[in-house]
């Protein structure tokens, strides 16, 4: 079993995209992140790769784009614990910092268990999520009411919503004054 890394996002995409697309609903964040950085070379804050087994079969695909969470995916029905352990060891041995992990529950728990042993780091679950695939769309009748553009009167509410959404979506705390400035610019 070994970790294979890529020096460019293009090489990573060329080698893994077909496999990631087979389970696109689960891999949307990983695919989007990779494609949005497709012209970049990997560096101190961007690491991508895969773990392959002794038969050269992919056991795990990963992308770590700091300051965001490590993204990990397995194309297999069962989790290869050794692959997850090897990824944790690789990250620690290469001093690659992670801010959290986004993966299925089994991968996340296995990774955290090994990573904690190696680093004494603590993890707190911030947001557990289920991934649901939209397979059918129904027409709906919009409720009665008036929609309007936001005004500066709405700024406190919109700023709080922005901060909460950021925390929910990215586990990132945003200062309310920064959110307020951003929302004020959008309203104007």
Question: Which residues make up each language-model segment?
Answer:
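Residues that form generic nucleotide/phosphate-binding pockets
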Residues: 19, 37, 90, 114, ...
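Acyl-donor-binding surface of acyltransferase catalytic domains
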Residues: 65-144
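An N-terminal domain-start capping segment
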Residues: 7-36, 40, 100-115
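Short amphipathic alpha-helix that is part of the acyltransferase structural core
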Residues: 1-30, 137-173
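Active-site rim helix/loop that mediates acceptor-substrate recognition in acyltransferases
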Residues: 26-45, 170-188
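Conserved donor-binding loop and adjoining core beta-sheet/short helix segment
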Residues: 4-5, 24, 32-94
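Short, well-ordered alpha-helical segments in soluble proteins
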Residues: 115, 119, 162-169, 187
